[in-house]
Amino acid sequence: GMDVHVPVLDANDRLAERHRGFFAAKNLVVINVFSSLGSGETCLLHMTAEMLRGRVRIGVIVGDLATDNDAERLSRADIPVVQITTGTMCHLDARMIAEAMKKMPLDDLDVLIIENVGNLVCPASYDLGEGVRVVLLSVTEGEDKPLKYPPMFHSADVALVTKSDLADAVDFNRDAALAALNKVAHHAHVIE
C-alpha cells in the first residue's frame, strides 16, 4: 500500500529542500518542465535558449527513459546539457538531480531548466528543489488534458499552451481548455 512510498518521498523531499537552499544561495532560477512526449518541449526550450542567448545563461538537465536526441539537439545550441537516463523509472527524483548537478557548471548559470520525463502521471509528486513548475499543454492533445492529469496540472505554477498554430487544424476549443485549466490549476499562470 501507500506506506511503502512515504519514506521514499520523505528522503526525496529532504534532499529537494537542500537543493532549493543551494540554488537560492547561487541565485539560480530552477524551472521544472513537465509535458507529454511530443508536446513541443524540446523545441520550446531551444527557442527560449535562442531568445535569451547572450543575456541569460541557461543550463538544461534532460530526463529520459532512454537516450534520445533531445540532449543532442539542445547541446548544439551551446547550452550545457546533462542527460539523465532514468531507465525504468518514470520520473526524475532529487537524487538524480544531485548527480546531474555535479556535471553542470552551476556557478556560470542564471537559469537551470529541468526537462522532466515525458509523462504526466508519475513526476507530479517528486519535488526536485525547483523554484517554478511549468506544465505544457499542446493543442494537439485536446482541451480535456488537464482533467486527465489533475495532480500534475494542480502542482503547476505555469501552464503553457503550445503548438497554438495548429489550434484550428485540430479543432482546439480554447474556452474549454481554459475552463479545464481553471478547474484543476486555478492558481497557475496560463501562457498562450
Stretch-by-stretch model annotation:
Residues 128, 143, 147-167, 177:
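Flexible active-site lid/hinge loop adjacent to a nucleotide/diphosphate
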Residues 67-71, 145-149, 173-179:
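Short, glycine/polar-rich helix-capping loops at beta-to-alpha or helix-loop-helix junctions
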Residues 165-192:
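Canonical P-loop GTPase G-domain recognition
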Residues 2-21, 26-31, 39, 43, ...:
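Nucleotide-state-sensitive switch-loop elements of NTP-binding domains
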